Structure formats: C-alpha cells, structure tokens
C-alpha cells in the first residue's frame, strides 16, 4: 500500500506555492484546519491517519497532516480533498442559516 502525506498547508489558498500550496489556487480553500481534512478523508472513504505535526517551513503556525492511502496521483487526491472541504463548509453554513431561521 502506497501512502502520501497531505499537509493542511498544501490545500490553503492563502499560501503561495513557495509557502507550501501544492494545488492551483482556484481549487484550494482558505485556512484549512486538520479536523476539516480528517472529515474530508472520512467522507471520501480513504484509509488515513492524522498527525498533529507542524509544517517545517512554517513551524510557528497551527496545522497538521494526514497520511493517506494513495489513490491516483497526489495532485488529484489533494484537489478532491479540497473540494470536499469546501462542500463540508457550505453544508455547515446552510445548517447555521437554518438554525437562525428556526429561532425567529
């Protein structure tokens, strides 16, 4: 089983390529958190393990990584994860709107 490491920084649209972003900005999402990356892996049915590690290039920032069973190319996997994170965020936004409407 081949594995690949995906850092939260790799999917962050606020980071430049030099700072660690690995996918095109149009696919990336801002301020990715480890728990979001874990949730995306679960929803995509990937075998993974999460690690609370610091990205070496920005060791002072919060972050983490997941070691994922490789499926296709690493770039395609990261784009798939970023899209799933964006989808999860949208679902949470809609749930918050629904809760506010119910309170009124």
From Swiss-Prot:
Superkingdom, natural source: Archaea
Localization per record: Cytoplasm
UniProt keyword annotations, A-Z: Cytoplasm, Ribonucleoprotein, RNA-binding, Signal recognition particle
One biological process term in Gene Ontology: SRP-dependent cotranslational protein targeting to membrane, signal sequence recognition
Alphabetized Pfam families for the sequence: SRP19
Subunit structure: Part of the signal recognition particle protein translocation system, which is composed of SRP and FtsY. Archaeal SRP consists of a 7S RNA molecule of 300 nucleotides and two protein subunits: SRP54 and SRP19.
HAMAP family, sorted: SRP19
Family to which the UniProt record says this protein belongs: Belongs to the SRP19 family.
Protein name: Signal recognition particle 19 kDa protein
